[in-house]
Amino acid sequence: KVVNMHPAPYKQEASFTFDEDLFNNCEDNVNLYGYFQSEKWFSHIENSIRKDFEWRDDVDAMCSQMFENITGGQAISLHIRRTDHLIKPTYHPVLPLSYYEEALSKFPSDIPVIVLSDDPAWCHEQELFQDDRFLISDSGDNITDMCLMSMCQYQIMANSTYSWWGAWLSNSEHVIAPKLWFGPDGQDPKDIYVKRWKYLDV
């Protein structure tokens, strides 16, 4: 067994708050550990980041065809995060359906809604999603779901990193996110919020 006795140095973010000192003084050729979930980290290289996150050709082709078939070219992405949030609700609370109902009221009512979730079985049971305009993804694949999310012109986010990136990659001007990101055991989310998005109370 070969052991690297001189691993590359690394920097780890202390919290979800943007660290200006780390941003200005981080040396080259280090590994970064953390979420770095704020536009403040990369707004100056936004185009490069978007290019780095472009979908593989096969994924893009499959999702584009799927998106066109189920939506006709326009859709609202509605993301629900449940599984791990149910375990630690004081850190990441599960958002109530009332949040999604209010968010839906802000968008046109004749646009199809793609419901994306880590708990699609639960979504199928909810009366809110029984109308024909709601299409619940049962893909079971995180890449497919995020690709579909990024193609939607309207976004209704959960308090989730996965949701954040899906909405950000869509580059949509019509994004609704919850003001409530963390519970009482969580951190200050101020730098997670993207200024151009709209935020609703929960």
Regions found by a protein language model. Give the residues of each.
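Donor-binding and catalytic core of enzymes assembling or modifying cell-surface/extracellular glycoconjugates
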Residues: L104-I192
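Secretory-pathway luminal glycosyltransferase catalytic domains
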Residues: K1-S109
